[in-house]
Structure formats: C-alpha cells, structure tokens
C-alpha cells in the first residue's frame, strides 16, 4: 500500500480534470463597456474538443470529422500558382520543421539593440511595462474628459455638433488605447518565460483593468452616447459600422447597470464582485486547486468531519482489471486492508476515470461513476449561489432571467429562441444518437450474455429487447472497446504525413487559393518577442494579392497583418492552443489627437500638453505603425495576433520534425480560422474588428476550417510524408475520418443536453427558493433519455454539474458552439463541398462574412452568404430553421 501526498493527489486531480476548466479566454469582447479586451478569440483547445466532451463520462472521444469526397484524378487546382510563393512556402515548412537551434543559425533573427517587445520602443525592460500603463491611463483621461464635455456642447453651433459627431470615434479610440496595452499584457503575463516580465505585465493588466472598471460606471460617457443617438443631425451622419460600434458601447454600459438608481447600482456592483469570486472558486474546485472562499472552508470542515469523499472498492470487483492498471490503482489507494481499497473522490478522480474505462465488473464502474461525479455539499451550494446571484443581477436590470439579460446582443437575442433551436436540434439528432448508442449496447450484449441477470436488466425505456439497458457508467468502457475494435484500431497513422511545417505551408496554399492571401516568414528584431530562444517564436507576415498596406511587403502584394507563432511547449507555458489578438485594425487618419489636448483635461482639471506625455503627436503611447491601404482611402493600424500551441519541439535535423496527430492538425486549423478572421476583418473601428463579434457567431470561421481540413483536396496541399515526400493516400484519410466520427451523433446529443442544462440554470428557475441544480440535471437527463438508456449522464448521489466549468465562462451561451457548428455545416455544403479550393466561393465568404468583423448583423451576413432570406430577421423561426438544418456528422 502506498499513499500519495496531498500535493500529488491534487496534481493528479488537476491533470485529470483540466479539460473541464474554462481555460479559454472569452471569444469576443467582455460584456462591459470598453472591456472588449481581445483576449484570445478562440479558446484554447478546450473550447473545440472539450465542448464536445465536457465530462470525462462523455459518450466518445471521437473527433469532429466531415463527409469525405473522393478527389478527382486531376487533383486540386491552385489559382495562379507562383514559384516565388512556393519558395516562401518551402521556407515556412523548413522554419517550422527544423527551427534554428542557435541565434547564429537563424537567418530570420536580426542583431543589434532591443527594439522593444512587439517593436514598441518603450518596452525594452519589464520595469517599463507599468510606466507604459501609467502613460496610457493619463492619455485615456484626456479622452474621457473630452467625451464627457461633449455632452454639454451646444448642439446649435458648428463646433458643438462637430464634437458630438466625434463621440463614437473617440470612444473607440479610448477602447483601442486601453485594450492595446491590456491585450498585450494578457499575453505576456501568460506566455513570457521571465517571471519579472510576467509580473510586470500582470501589474499593468490589473492597473488598467481597474481603471476600465471605473469607466464602466461613468454616467457622463453613457449619457453623451445615449444623447447623440437621439440627435437626428448626429445619428444620420454615422456609418453602419459606426452605428454598430455605438450600439455595442450602449449595451455594454447598460449591462453594467449604469442606468440604475444609485442604490441599485451599488447592489449591482456587489453582486458582480460576488459572482466573480464564486466563479473563481468554482473553477479552482474543478481544477483540483484549493479555493479560498467560505464555501471552500465549509467543504474542508465537512470532509474532515465525516470523510464524505471517501470511496471504498472491494478488491474482488477488480479481479478482471488488467494487472498493470490494477497495480497502479492499488498503489494509489489510501488504505488497502481486508480486501477493501479506499480512495478520495475529491483528490483522486483519475482512479475512477481509469476504472470507468477498464473495470469489467459493472459494480465497480457504478461506484467509480458516482465518485468521478462527486461534488461536496459546499461545491453544490457555491454553484447554486452563483446561479442565484446571476438571477438577482438580471432582475436588477429589469430582465426576467440571466439568460434574457445576457442574450440581448447575441444572435439568439432571447432564451425562447435558444430553446427553439435546441428543441429542433434535439429532434434532428436523436435518431443518430440512438443509432450510435446501439453500437455500444451490442458490445455490452456481447460482453454480458453469460453474466447474471442483473447485468442485462430490461426496462420500459428499452425498445430493443434484444440488447441490454445501457447505464451512464457503461459509456467509457464500451466507447474504449468500440475504438479498439478490429475495424477501427487498424486505421493507418496519419502523423508521418503531418509535420508542423507542412501543415503551415498547406494553410498558406489554402488561403491563397480561397482568398488571395498567403504567409511569408519575416525577420524578428532583437527584443521583439517574449521568448527569445532560437526559433521559440516565429513571425509570419500575412499578404494579400489585391489589398493591404502600400509598399511594405517587398512584393506586389500588400501587408494586411502579422501572426506570431509560439508553437513549442516549454516549461511554464500554458497548455492547449489559443488565439490572442494583440492589436486590432482601426482607421487612424481621422483621429483628432490635437483636439484631445484642446478640449480634454487631466482628472484633476489640469491642462495637459503633448510634451507632458512624451512629446508632440503623442496619440497612443504604444506608437503602433500605421499604413496607407491600396483598396481604400486612409491610414490604418494593422492587426497583430499570436497563435499559441504546445507542440513538442523538434530536435536536431537527425531527429526529424514535429509530427502532429489529427486532432492537433484540427486544432491548428481551428485557431487559424480565428487568425484569418482577424486579418480579413480590418474594420475602421477597433471595437468591431476581426473576432470582436457576437459570442454565438465568432466560432463560425474556425469551425468552418475543420471542414476544410477533412477535405481530401485540402489535405493534398499539406500532407506529405516527412521523409519521402509522398502524398497521404486517400484510403488512409477516409478510414481515419470514418473511425473518428463513428460516435459523433452520441457526442453531439450529449452536448445538446449540456446546452439545455445551461439554459435551465440561467432561466427563472434559478430565482426560485426551491431551486436545486441536481434535481434540474436529473429531470433533464431523464427527459432526454434514449431507447435503452433511461439515464444518459446522471445517477442518484452524483453531482456532475459541479464539473461543468463552462457554466461560469459561458453562462447561458453554451449553445454557441452548437449553433456555429450547424451554420458552418450549412456554409460548407452551400459554398465549398463541391470544390473546397474554389476562388469564387472563397471571395463570397471573404467579402460577405469575414471582412465585416462584428460590424454587421450576423443574421444579415448569414442570409447573404447562403442566399437564405428566410433567416434574415434572426427571430424564433430563424433559430428553429437553423436547428432543423442539424450538424453534418
């Protein structure tokens, strides 16, 4: 018998449950004024894969895969292939497949003094980060005062009208000013290997976020914004994009409770703070870390008093477990005496997840399932207090539920529309889920034909009497057996054909074919990137054949943005994948910086001169470069994004490149969907640039990329054997995709259940004194039963809801991923299924969807892209229609 230390137990718990935690940064702007900090639009890999498998008990570990189309004998056709482009693609492949091992070997790393992080001259040392934040705040105060004073401007004078017309642009400038530092600090505090830099970035982040929280309750800014939208002479001069920006700010103000009377506004702030603390504790519990609030102290005292998390397993239930697995399980037991093993449900979840997969005795799996879904009374109480606090917050704003409050600026608009969508989607996918379930029931039948009768019990839910009833604790084991079956386990590996460099070069070829956009490796200046080891961070220019900055790319193309690729795992770096937006597109030549100093004042009322803040023309302390554009008038700052992954770094040339698994290729394509959205969505206003759009729309471009990667025509562009150069055989891809999607219907059905649970938890139910999150889960689980499975993911005594981390980060919007999966399937079939490399189809999607960022109603975008006017209104009928489309599996 061996007992692991408390820290080791917690570490194991953290690993086992890490995919439950909402690690992803929000996919769009934060729901408060000016807080649309462009934290990574896509969520780390969790938001793609875990949204399908949020529980370890999910029906399958299969990956999303789409219909395979056999390529024509002619192979894919590239639009105007150019030899220079292929040279650049070859350089990309070489750069990522064999990154330099020393600075002297890196021809893309220049020498000389530091140019500053992201080539910001002032950021040459961590000490300067807070100084930059302070300069930014001082500059922001001038803008705030100027906007506030515009509210008292005389609208009957030319100057008064001029100032009022500048309000939306000035608010957007203010947002860009603050987010430019906050977004960068968010990246640096997470990714920089030097603790000094990380701490300095965190200090700057918290400093400016604190100021932003003050702005969220600035009644002067709210009043002047509301006022200009009611002045016809001003409102009529706003472009559609500017109007969209104004509406975003207005909604975010009101979601912050700014329109409430003082006493109610104070309560709003109190509740918001409480929700934040509760949410952090909720996620810390899931991660296996110790929360520090009152609920954590109650839970600790309860566990010490009654040992409620202790689980006993008779050893004779484990006799048929693989000896190697059993040895590891027994070694982890807290006690092993008299034929009984004891474990901690709170600290050793990996034990129970292992037994759910590999314990043939159903009694052991049933105990393991309940333990894997263990939730202390205090954890349940914390979640329910979180949901009730949200319900009270919504009531303060005049909404009937938190979902109603949160969905006003989403595609769904209101909870009833989400329910229409999910109801239609449930009906569409139920037959497919039942079909997949029967595959697992047959495996159970084959395994239990000689077992005692209690293992093959029947019920009124079992419409196929020849197959045994399926319990929640059966899922993991028979899913594991399903994928180990002869027909699926013999699938040929794809990794030898999928080196990081080949995939990156293939992405460049794909975007060139579709959008006339490609990648080119670029020189990295000293001090420009956060991890300066040779080859740690690569810089990639994004070029457009007909648009972009004049005369910057050294070719006939124009520069439209920059991607920094931080792909290799290193100590201290966050796991998973993420897309960070460091800088957004914005038109700058119309900025009236001089007017800030004329009309604005410091917070203490002082007149401020440009030289007081660093010199003449000090508009933005970041001093971001700006460029004239070939396709439109004006000067723009260009988007800068960071693509972060944790792939294994290649060794020396003899060891070969980093070879990716299929799910890692999907991850790269998914995150690149966000990146290309940022590159193409170069709007005139920061606040609607790129991925700054509705939460339930932002995943469309990235999910669509998953369709591309499973197309043979596209795979032909990127899959080459790393040593022979041979193309990936079609039959290898076909068999892999068939295997990976073989239980997709069941996975999707379970995700629908979680989306419906999220809606119930954020409905009026949460405000009821008798509300029980466990009862609500149990009732929904029974309601959504499948033939032969009276319960999908619940059994008495379990509390699976306390493992559903997305309840905090995506409260009432968990349906978003499902909605965008449906839309992506429809767009794929409408535009790309017949020819994934068609330039005309690519231009339609580029010009009717991607280029608008968040500046156009997503329903109008969808109607235009699909030629489906029936969904243009985005009402309940539109949501119901989208639900009926279903997700192609």
From Swiss-Prot:
Binds 1 zinc ion. Residues 100-112 have a biased composition (Polar residues). The active site is at 671. Residues 83-94 have a biased composition (Basic and acidic residues). Its EC number is 3.4.24.59. GO terms for biological process: peptide metabolic process; protein processing involved in protein targeting to mitochondrion. This is Mitochondrial intermediate peptidase. It comes from Mycosarcoma maydis. The lineage of its organism: Eukaryota, Fungi, Dikarya, Basidiomycota, Ustilaginomycotina. The gene is OCT1.
